[in-house]
Design a protein with these regions (language model features):
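FAD-dependent flavoprotein oxygenase/oxidase catalytic domain
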Residues: 1-434
């Protein structure tokens, strides 16, 4: 029997905010959001790419017009050789727009989060910051209580874990054995203001080059702002006394940033032509560099605790990266998270209409629908990530030739930008509800 009223959302990133907004406006539920970090830290991050499948969901959430003022629509992706020549220009907007109404969009993470916060505030959704979750208790199958380190607690009929790849909801309750694994790759990046580009006619393009040391790419992310990153293989740092890999990365950031600058400098020195000149100018204008190691969650993890595990009917579900974080190399992280949100909302509508008799049936259907897509995107991300491996100059030359050849036939085989199939970016999660 449908008995949902209040929803607790753990995490005030894109997944958590989108979930609260959708469940409030479409399902008429009463969400409340709890976030570990303070408001400034909760919005940190670099630039995000969102393909058509994610943009369509964000439009249905009523966010598109707000986002459009803060980001940039990308028209094409341009692949450069290290020698400076253009290997191929690929239109990434026309066909998706014709079929979905949307193309490919880039926006700073902090701006996307602010759009979501503004939308949540318009709907009077409370957001509590600085709340460290310490325990989760499901009571008799009809409610769930969360307790925080400051001694406060809250109870609702549904709990959504939207707290990212290092999810506390997953660690404390849903799947304690599931741990993030390191992909072997990391990236250094920066957002640069007001780069002189008066001679360039491609201010709405994403540019990339594969080098022997990794991949270098850049794209606009806001008015008068450009994002660039250098992604390469990075060994796992030595473990610290705490046993937490994140502590090792913290030390790595402090000690190895100079080595990254040196590696990047050698890459830039080998790049020629106008493209190389522009990238040296862009990197030289960067003030704040950030390093991020890329983690993912192994496939097969649990997204809810089934009643057959000795517990009552479940009231807790993981969404977004908390459930299925993939490497960023498919450009689908935000899109997958908001797809989760739209699907859950639709299933809860069907639950209210009597198509399901228990919340566990809703969770089970959600799981069966999402698993194949997550597996597909995970494989794509892993495959794209391997292009960042260290390699000889001769192998880079061969790959440049191979990509030139493949990009000429991708559209014939139904492929678009960087090997992402049209089926991936034209996917409509709401069609799964029919």
């Amino acid at each position: 029997m449908y008995d949902l009223q209040k929803v607790i959302v753990i995490g005030a990133g894109p997944a958590g905010l989108a979930a609260a907004i959708r469940l409030a406006q479409h399902n008429k539920l009463n969400p409340v959001i709890y976030e570990l970090r303070n408001p400034d830290a909760a919005g940190i991050g670099g630039s995000l790419g969102i393909p058509a499948n994610g943009l369509r969901v964000l439009y249905r959430l009523g966010l598109w017009d707000m986002m459009l003022r803060r980001g940039v629509e990308i028209s094409k992706t341009i692949l450069h050789s290290a020698a400076g020549s253009i290997l191929r220009e690929v239109d990434v907007a026309t066909e998706p727009k014709q079929q979905t109404g949307f193309g490919y969009f880039r926006i700073n993470r902090v701006d996307l989060v602010q759009c979501l916060r503004d939308a949540a505030q318009e709907r009077q959704i409370p957001i509590h910051y600085g709340k460290q979750l310490t325990s989760i208790d499901e009571h008799g199958g009809d409610r769930v209580t969360v307790t925080f380190s400051d001694g406060t607690s809250d109870t609702a009929s549904l709990l959504l874990g939207c707290d990212g790849i290092h999810s506390t909801v997953r660690r404390l309750y849903v799947d304690p054995e599931m741990k993030p694994v390191y992909s072997g790759f990391g990236a250094i990046s920066a957002i640069v203001d007001d780069v002189d580009s008066h001679e360039r006619k491609d201010a709405t393009c994403l540019h990339s080059t594969i080098t022997p040391q990794g991949m270098l790419a850049t794209a606009p992310c806001a008015a008068n702002q450009t994002f660039w990153f250098f992604s390469k293989e990075v060994p796992l740092p030595p473990a610290t006394d705490s046993g937490d890999e994140r502590d090792g990365w913290s030390l790595y950031r402090q000690n190895e940033l100079a080595a990254w600058r040196s590696s990047l400098s050698s890459v830039l020195d080998c790049m020629q032509g106008q493209w190389g000149q522009y990238m040296r100018q862009l990197v030289g204008s960067s003030k704040d560099l950030h390093f991020y190691p890329h983690y993912r969650l192994p496939l097969g993890g649990r997204w809810f605790v089934p009643s057959g595990s000795g517990r009552d009917s479940p009231r807790t579900l993981l969404l977004g990266d908390a459930a299925h974080a993939v490497q960023p190399h498919a450009g689908q992280g935000v899109a997958l998270a908001v797809e989760d949100v739209l699907l859950l909302s639709g299933l809860l509508t069907q639950y209210q209409a009597g198509e399901y008799t228990a919340l566990e049936e809703v969770f089970g259907r959600f799981d069966r629908i999402r698993r194949p897509r997550i597996e597909q995107i995970n494989e794509l991300a892993s495959r794209n990530g391997r292009m960042r491996r260290n390699q000889s100059p001769w192998l880079v030359w061969f790959k440049e030739w191979y990509m030139w050849f493949m990009l000429h036939i991708n559209w014939f085989w139904g492929m678009s930008m960087s090997g992402v199939s049209n089926g991936d970016i034209l996917y409509d999660v709401e069609a799964e509800l029919k």
